[in-house]
Amino acid sequence: MDVKERALQAHEKWGGKIEVVARCEVNSKDDLSITYTPGVAEPCLKIKDDPSLSYTYTRRHNLVAVITDGTAVLGLGDIGPIAGMPVMEGKCALFKAFADVDAFPLCVASKDVDEIVRTIQLISGSFGGINLEDIAAPRCFEIERRLKEVCDIPVFHDDQHGTAVCCGAALLNACRLTGRKVDEIKMVVNGCGAAAIAVTKFLMFLGVKHITMVERFGIVCEGDDRLNPAQEEMAKVTNREHMTGTLADAVKGADVFFGMSAPQVLTAEMVSTMAKDPMVFAMANPVPEIWPEDAKKGGAAVVGTGRSDYPNQINNVLAFPGIFRGALDVRASDINEEMKLAAAKAIAACVSDEELNAEYIMPMAFDKKVIRSVADAVAQAARDSGVARI
């Protein structure tokens, strides 16, 4: 039986991957009077006088909403909000399993930015954080930006920023292994969608100075009328040499390739034209931009993918549970760049100098020290950057 059939049978058996479990006992009239009426009125009045006490008297301090509009679900595309529910439930299960964060799935039946923003804003007071999931670009950029402006809790689009943090960790360790400095490398990012743009911005914040982005139609250049507004913004801050041409042209002499695009677009021959001992991160799923075996044939010193059946899996589960755990622990009002940078460095540091090798630059997803290390680093960065409230 293949994994698809096994998953279908498991989901039918489970009848959902999450449930609500009471933290209080309701076994007597006294329990009832404390848990509900009349006793519940007292914390209500306290919160009325001081809304911040909602973090003390309710589960808000540990509760995250996982929200989608169903327009970019995994590799399935626009399948609608209800069809995206199994993914949202799965994400909630990962939050609980890895970081003891209580998460709740919400599937919003709208593609209107104003409606989505208003809906999330209105319910945000029930949660300690918002995790946006599987929302198509470029709409996802505006939704996140506007929510950050109107909500006083962290809003985090994991498809963008969780990916970016993990890519940052992979780059730090690949550079550590190959003896390169982040600010001296030449990088190519293939793709210019939500994840690719977020990764590029974050790696620039990390210190990378020389990045060229490539889309289906070729190298991303300022002034190209085929670019959407988000891509135009990236064209202004990348491609310092104002190159034109194809992916094959872009990778010549490059130290690093990051792919968030399409299957089998990079060849071993292209890799052979890159700088000595190049680093190749082919993250398209399930079929990467180049298979690791072919990348190594082309001379790649380090290869990473999004797949669990190859070494160096770049998996968001290394990032988002710990990031939210750290943010919730200090009641952060935002998840900012400093916190994401701290997360990337913490993930990278979970691989010691003794452990680091070409087949092991990323810690394993089930390494228990990862989530705690990330959470502690994120919490400290929140304090240092002024967004922590406790």
Regions found by a protein language model. Name each.
Residues 1-155, 375, 380-381, 385-389:
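N-terminal ligand-binding/catalytic initiation module
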Residues 232-301, 307-309:
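Rossmann-like adenosine-cofactor binding region
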Residues 158-159, 178-180, 282-390:
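Adenosine-phosphate binding glycine-rich loop
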Residues 69-71, 79, 108-109, 134-137, ...:
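Short, ordered loop/turn segments at secondary-structure junctions
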Residues 105, 131-134, 155-158, 189, ...:
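General beta-strand structural signal in soluble alpha/beta enzymes
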Residues 12, 55-60, 96-97, 122-124, ...:
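Solvent-exposed alpha-helices and their adjacent loops that cap or buttress functional pockets
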Residues 74, 79-99, 151, 157, ...:
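Glycine-rich phosphate/diphosphate-binding loop of Rossmann-like nucleotide-binding domains
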